[in-house]
């Protein structure tokens, strides 16, 4: 090892005796933390020696002494770079911070560089130091280098006080300037070096290291971070280690870093040139492939004589030609051409190309400017509607009005006003089987338009209406767009079937999506999520069908024109069965028109006694069953065609009637009244039964059964309170209610019921119970009752009167304020019923209860049943 060179210092140097830990082709600068693998014998021996023997030092170089570990100094080693087997003259004093085992086995030591040092002369190992690398102290080895561990003098160099050895730090002292000037120069060099290092680290994406470097304020510490730099050679790092002067270190680092950045710029320029060349070659390859495809298509066209099948239909050029030739709105054409441009830039193997082609096919398939010519022959349109459906005059009149208005607009040249055309949104509400769905086809045929049915029952995904966004795999347009594409025109009749069966879940609310579709003020600019272009729906005739209006949100119902289909009369059912149902079922049974003849009396019996519904589905099923019986008897030889069926023959084919008038039987006893109600299947007859508990065994209060809702329970309470407060006026023994409980029951018990219209029926039943006068068997009633006895209006009058007519009742009591609703009731039903319009409960009781006779006239007294009902005029 070379002798210690001369170093000019301002005070006495600090000399320590430390074990040498050689580093092959590596340099540790002060401030660096390194992990040393102790599988190397020299490394392990040096670490063990430092930990067992410590270091020796003295502030006076002329009288050095050895201090023990007990003095508090941490275990230190001298990290000496070794290049080509030779130890360098400069080294780093390192503190052993931790020794431990590695996860994969073996051990390692964590050493932190603390100061620069010059390597001095060889010293004997301290007493008690392990010099063999085995970790066992040998008390007899007090001199020499030991077996594997060398101890030397380490002259610690102070960056702030020392002048580097040799020519590295101007040994002649020619550099002028005060300490303040030197500090300013060092700060300037540090800022410049920090900027270069930060730029280099940002290029590499080492953002965490950038933050660490930016946090260093000491110039010397900043310069020593160069020990981590991979672009510096070992010789350059040794030169930095031997340069205590901070300014000189920073100058050299600036020179080396700038040279490295220049090399990086040249390498980046070369890489960019190579990449541009590759891109140019790839672009040229794609263009040549497209040119070959165009030439191939041209040659095929020439060979086929210009036939339409020559084009592939899947190439971007073909899509561009189709878009330019199609009759598209300007905004749609611009969007389609933009997608064609994307398709031309897309690789054939990219899945995006398939998505673009699907979108273009959808756009090109839509009939953007195709509209069916409306049939303005109003008389012919009405004839079509009458031929397909009996009754339903409200709907037919509305369609005729729509056609008349469109013809008027066409004559006046008002096809489009404010961007909107003359479409309509109608809601057909009514019980099942009244012909709501089939009516849509008849309307389309009468108007000369195409018809599309969109089934919405059970739909819970908002995307089913507005479409899926194209970012999703397998995206499709919504049902409205698909219906327009299927119809082939922009003004079809679209039937939104079962709109009240829509549901909502985590995927959205389809009814909210329908708000834009069915709003005449918005649907001329409808935007499907898949198409993302405006679609004009203002010329579409939307027909929405529903059974229960309460299930439709109010904002959606507000956007539709409501038309109620309350059901058919018995005569209308007979006409429908004779003109439509019978012919259809004859075909399904394989019978000719003259093989089976069903008389009108038999059809009346089927409609009134074997079925009792608002629609005609059960009636059609009964006809089908009847014809099957006939076919079976013919096959068995029990009958021969042709067969004529009258009302008396039905029992032999279908058994006894299922529905017979029961009002007379139920109301024969006091306490039972007949009411009218509206259900999801139309109108129905409702019976209210009341009874009084025995005075000795029954408790007080009122008991309500029959799955009654809150409103219906309140109606019973109001009825009882009214009778208690007006019992004297009505000549009713209300004193019996003091200690006798009242029970009100509304069959059938398994069916939930609610609503205010049963109030008058409950009042009549309780009055009948208290007076002992039965309710007339031919009377039905409906209306809400107040505490003062006023009869208030209710809804569903048409359906309730149809139900009363079906049940064979002849007298109906209605609130006075429901008089205008009688205009909606079919004339045959109005003529068959005696309708009394009442305003007070007293009128109801006078009309509904059987008259009471005293004993002097030989009749019954109050509290007993007996005499037959007497008809009363309104």
From Swiss-Prot:
Region (Disordered): 47-68, 120-144, 298-318, 853-874
Binding-site list for ATP: 430-437
Residue ranges constituting the Lon proteolytic domain according to the UniProt record: 667-851
Cell compartments where the protein resides: Cytoplasm
Enzyme Commission (EC) number: 3.4.21.53
UniProt feature, compositional bias: Low complexity: 124-142
Source taxon at top rank: Bacteria
Gene3D superfamilies (UniProt xref): 1.10.8.60, 1.20.5.5270, 1.20.58.1480, 3.30.230.10, LON domain-like (2.30.130.40), P-loop containing nucleotide triphosphate hydrolases (3.40.50.300)
GO MF annotation list: ATP binding; ATP hydrolysis activity; ATP-dependent peptidase activity; sequence-specific DNA binding; serine-type endopeptidase activity
Keywords associated with the record: ATP-binding, Cytoplasm, Hydrolase, Nucleotide-binding, Protease, Serine protease, Stress response
Known catalytic reactions: Hydrolysis of proteins in presence of ATP
GO BP field: cellular response to heat; protein quality control for misfolded or incompletely synthesized proteins
Active-site residue list: 757, 800
Signal sequence, start to end: none
Domain Lon N-terminal: 18-261
SUPFAM superfamilies: P-loop containing nucleoside triphosphate hydrolases, PUA domain-like, Ribosomal protein S5 domain 2-like
Function comment: ATP-dependent serine protease that mediates the selective degradation of mutant and abnormal proteins as well as certain short-lived regulatory proteins. Required for cellular homeostasis and for survival from DNA damage and developmental changes induced by stress. Degrades polypeptides processively to yield small peptide fragments that are 5 to 10 amino acids long. Binds to DNA in a double-stranded, site-specific manner.
HAMAP family for this protein: lon_bact (MF_01973)
Family: Belongs to the peptidase S16 family.
Subunit field text: Homohexamer. Organized in a ring with a central cavity.
Listed name of the protein: Lon protease
Native species: Frankia alni (strain DSM 45986 / CECT 9034 / ACN14a)
């Amino acid at each position: 090892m070379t002798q210690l060179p001369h170093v000019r210092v301002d005070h006495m140097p600090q000399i320590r005796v430390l074990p040498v830990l050689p580093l092959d082709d590596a340099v540790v600068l002060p401030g660096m933390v390194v992990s040393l693998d102790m599988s190397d014998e020299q490394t392990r021996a040096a670490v063990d020696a430092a930990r067992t023997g410590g270091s020796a030092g003295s502030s006076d170089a002329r009288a050095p002494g050895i201090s023990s570990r007990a003095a508090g100094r941490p275990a230190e080693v001298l990290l000496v770079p070794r290049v080509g087997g030779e130890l360098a003259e400069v080294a780093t004093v390192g503190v052993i911070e931790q020794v431990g085992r590695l996860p994969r086995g073996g051990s390692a030591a964590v050493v932190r560089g603390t100061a620069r040092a010059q390597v001095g002369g060889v010293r004997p190992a301290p007493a008690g130091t392990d010099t063999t690398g085995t970790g066992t102290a040998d008390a007899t080895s007090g001199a020499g280098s030991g077996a594997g561990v060398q101890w030397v003098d380490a002259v610690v160099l102070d960056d702030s006080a020392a002048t580097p050895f040799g020519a590295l730090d101007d040994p002649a002292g020619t550099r002028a300037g005060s300490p303040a000037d030197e500090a300013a120069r060092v700060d300037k060099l540090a800022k410049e070096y920090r900027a270069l290092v930060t730029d280099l680290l940002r290029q590499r994406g080492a953002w965490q290291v950038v933050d660490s470097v930016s946090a260093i304020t000491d110039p010397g510490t900043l310069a020593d971070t160069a020990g981590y730099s991979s672009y510096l050679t070992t010789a350059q790092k040794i030169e930095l280690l031997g340069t205590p002067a901070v300014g000189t270190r920073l100058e050299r680092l600036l020179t080396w870093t700038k040279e490295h950045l220049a090399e990086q710029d040249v390498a980046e320029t070369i890489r960019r040139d190579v990449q541009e060349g590759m891109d140019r070659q790839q672009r040229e390859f794609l263009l040549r492939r497209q040119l070959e495809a165009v030439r191939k298509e041209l040659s095929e066209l020439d060979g086929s004589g210009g036939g339409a099948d020559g084009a592939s239909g899947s190439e971007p050029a073909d899509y561009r030609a189709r878009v330019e030739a199609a009759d598209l709105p300007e905004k749609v054409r611009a969007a389609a051409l933009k997608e064609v441009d994307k398709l031309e830039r897309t690789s054939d193997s990219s899945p995006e190309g398939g998505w673009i082609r699907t979108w273009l096919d959808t756009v090109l398939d839509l009939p953007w400017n195709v509209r069916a010519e409306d049939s303005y022959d109003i008389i012919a349109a009405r004839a079509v509607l009458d031929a397909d459906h009996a009754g339903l005059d409200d709907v037919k009149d509305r369609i005729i009005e729509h056609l008349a208005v469109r013809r008027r607009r066409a004559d006046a040249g008002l096809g489009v006003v404010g961007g909107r055309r003359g479409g309509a949104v109608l809601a057909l509400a009514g019980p099942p089987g009244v012909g709501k769905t089939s009516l849509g086809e008849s309307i389309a045929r009468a108007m000369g338009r195409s018809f599309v049915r969109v089934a919405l029952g059970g739909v819970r995904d908002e995307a089913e209406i507005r479409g899926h966004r194209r970012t999703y795999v397998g995206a499709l347009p919504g049902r409205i767009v698909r219906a327009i594409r299927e119809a082939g025109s922009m003004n079809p009749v679209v039937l939104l079937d079962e709109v009240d069966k829509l549901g909502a879940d985590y995927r959205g609310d389809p009814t909210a999506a329908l708000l834009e579709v069915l709003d005449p003020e918005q649907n001329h600019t409808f935007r499907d999520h898949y198409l993302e272009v405006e679609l004009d729906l203002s010329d579409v005739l939307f027909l929405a069908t529903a059974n229960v209006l309460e299930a439709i949100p109010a904002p959606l119902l507000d956007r539709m024109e409501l038309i109620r289909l309350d059901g058919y009369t018995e005569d209308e059912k007979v006409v429908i069965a004779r003109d439509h149902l019978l012919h259809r079922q004859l075909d399904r049974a394989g019978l000719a028109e003259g093989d089976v003849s069903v008389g009108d009396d038999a059809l009346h019996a089927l409609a009134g006694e074997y079925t009792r519904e608002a629609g005609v589905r059960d009636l059609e099923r009964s006809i089908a069953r009847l014809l099957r019986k006939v076919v079976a008897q013919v096959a068995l030889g029990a009958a021969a065609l042709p067969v004529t069926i009258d009302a008396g023959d039905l029992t032999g084919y279908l058994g006894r009637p299922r529905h017979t008038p029961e009002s007379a039987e139920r109301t024969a006893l006091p306490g039972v009244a007949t009411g009218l109600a509206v259900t999801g299947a139309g109108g129905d007859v409702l019976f209210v039964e009341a009874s009084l508990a025995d005075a000795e065994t029954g408790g007080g209060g009122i008991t309500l059964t029959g799955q009654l809702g809150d409103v219906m329970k309140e109606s019973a309470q109001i009825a009882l309170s009214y009778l208690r407060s007006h019992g004297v006026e009505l000549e009713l023994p209300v004193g019996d209610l003091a200690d006798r409980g009242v029970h009100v029951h509304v069959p059938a018990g398994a069916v939930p019921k609610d609503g205010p219209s049963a109030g008058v029926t409950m009042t009549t039943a309780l009055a009948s119970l208290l007076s002992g006068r039965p309710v007339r068997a031919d009377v039905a009633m409906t209306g809400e009752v107040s505490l003062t006895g006023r009869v208030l209006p209710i809804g569903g009058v048409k359906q309730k009167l149809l139900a009363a007519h079906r049940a064979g009742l002849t007298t109906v009591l209605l609130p006075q304020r429901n008089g205008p609703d009688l205009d909606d009731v079919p004339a045959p039903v109005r003529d068959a019923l005696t309708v009394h319009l009442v305003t007070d409960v007293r009128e109801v009781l006078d009309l509904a209860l059987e008259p009471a006779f005293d004993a002097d006239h030989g009749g019954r007294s109050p509290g007993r049943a007996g005499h037959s009902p007497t008809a009363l005029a309104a």
